[in-house]
């Protein structure tokens, strides 16, 4: 199996196993870290295992290879197609970010974010909706941000990690500052760090988010496959 196939499962059983809650053929991150959940296979055993991890009325966010098919005991809350994109050509960004994927740009100072910034990070994610982001998501990897007059206005960071690959995630900019190149600047810094570790950068994005997809393609990302992000709620007894 390729490391990016069933990538949430692979993260929770390899490089990020320390964050996993496990039962049978199911895994999920500690909900304070992220709502991402996975099973070995989307079969009755997988859903039965998942039912032991998710309480009645609670939700699970899955990334499925195929469209969700109704399962006993589960209510479909939301599903939408996404793209898994990979930047194999990361070499152009090493040592000063020279190459075809870069252009002159001088953003405000980029700062590393951590526990003291958690509330601001959650608030920015709640406003801009880049994907699930919890009070401990920053523990998954390096997160960088840009501030304006002391206020966090843009951020990006690392989320899923599997052998040889790290995901860039939570790429978002406050609506009042969109179009200034902040997301691009932050992504380049995260991608450079990943490349320096000898890893390949990947990401996930809504298939309908044309603005983001265009940015990622300019940075050298290519679509690897379509995935189906699916939110399920466990039915109450």
Regions found by a protein language model. Name each.
Residues 1-4, 92-131:
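Short amphipathic alpha-helix that is part of the acyltransferase structural core
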Residues 1-22, 26-102:
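Acyl-donor-binding surface of acyltransferase catalytic domains
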Residues 45-50, 179-194, 213-218:
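Conserved acetyl-CoA-binding loop-helix of GNAT-fold acetyltransferases
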Residues 37-38, 171-178:
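A short, internal acetyl-CoA/4′-phosphopantetheine-binding micro-motif in the GNAT/acyltransferase core
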Residues 62-67, 193, 202-213, 229-237:
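Conserved beta-strand-loop-alpha-helix junction that forms the acyl-donor binding cleft
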Residues 132-172:
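A conserved beta-strand-loop-helix scaffold within acyl/acetyltransferase catalytic domains
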Residues 77-87, 222-236:
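Conserved catalytic-core motifs of GNAT/GCN5-like acyltransferases
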Residues 69-74, 184, 207-225:
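Conserved active-site alpha-helix within GNAT-family acetyltransferase domains
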